[in-house]
C-alpha cells in the first residue's frame, strides 16, 4: 500500500495568489477546459505529470494514451495520488488530487480502449504540469 500524499490546505485567497485565473477556475471551482485546447492532449514525452496546484506526482507518462477525446487521457494514477467521487447524478466519477483536492477531471470505465485497467482518466491539461524523465525518479 502506497503512502498517502501530504495534505495541502490553503484559503481561497492563497489559491488565487498561486494559480492563474484559469487554473483556479478548473482546480478550485471544478471547471473544464475546452476540448482540444490543452497543452498535454497530444503530448507524449517520458516523465511524470504533477498536480499544478501542489506539485504532487499524479501520473506516469507510460499510462497516458491517445483517446481522441480532446483531453489528456491516462489509464491509471500513481497509488494513493487520486481520489474518486461519484457525481450526484451517478453518470460520472470526479477525480481530484488526494493532497490538495484540486479538480483534475473525470474517470470513465468500460469504454473499450484496451488498456490494462479499462479506464480513461480524462484530465484537464490546466490541472497538471510535466516533469521530464531525467528529473524524475518515479518512472
Curated annotation (Swiss-Prot):
| Pfam families linked | SelR
- Provide the alphabetized UniProt keywords: Acetylation, Cytoplasm, Disulfide bond, Electron transport, Metal-binding, Oxidoreductase, Redox-active center, Transport, Zinc
Compartments reported by the entry: Cytoplasm, Cytosol
- One GO CC term of this entry? cytosol
Q: Where is the MsrB domain?
A: 12-133
Residues where N-acetylalanine is found: 2
Which Cys residues form disulphide pairs?
A: 69-122
- What is the enzyme's main class? oxidoreductase
Question: PROSITE patterns, from UniProt?
Answer: MSRB
Q: Which GO terms describe its biological process?
A: protein repair; response to oxidative stress
The protein's required cofactors: Zn(2+)
Which GO molecular function annotations are given, in alphabetical order? metal ion binding; peptide-methionine (R)-S-oxide reductase activity
Database matches in InterPro entries: Met_Sox_Rdtase_MsrB, Met_Sox_Rdtase_MsrB_dom, Mss4-like_sf
Q: What is its EC number?
A: 1.8.4.12
Q: Which residues of this UniProt protein bind Zn(2+)?
A: 51, 54, 97, 100
Catalytic reaction annotation: L-methionyl-[protein] + [thioredoxin]-disulfide + H2O = L-methionyl-(R)-S-oxide-[protein] + [thioredoxin]-dithiol
Task: Locate the active site.
Answer: 122 (nucleophile)
Note describing how the cofactor binds? Binds 1 zinc ion per subunit.
Any idea what job this protein has?
A: Catalyzes the reduction of methionine sulfoxide (MetSO) to methionine in proteins. Plays a protective role against oxidative stress by restoring activity to proteins that have been inactivated by methionine oxidation. MSRB family specifically reduces the MetSO R-enantiomer.
- What family name appears in the similarity comment? Belongs to the MsrB Met sulfoxide reductase family.
Q: What is the name listed in the Swiss-Prot or TrEMBL entry for this protein?
A: Peptide methionine sulfoxide reductase B5
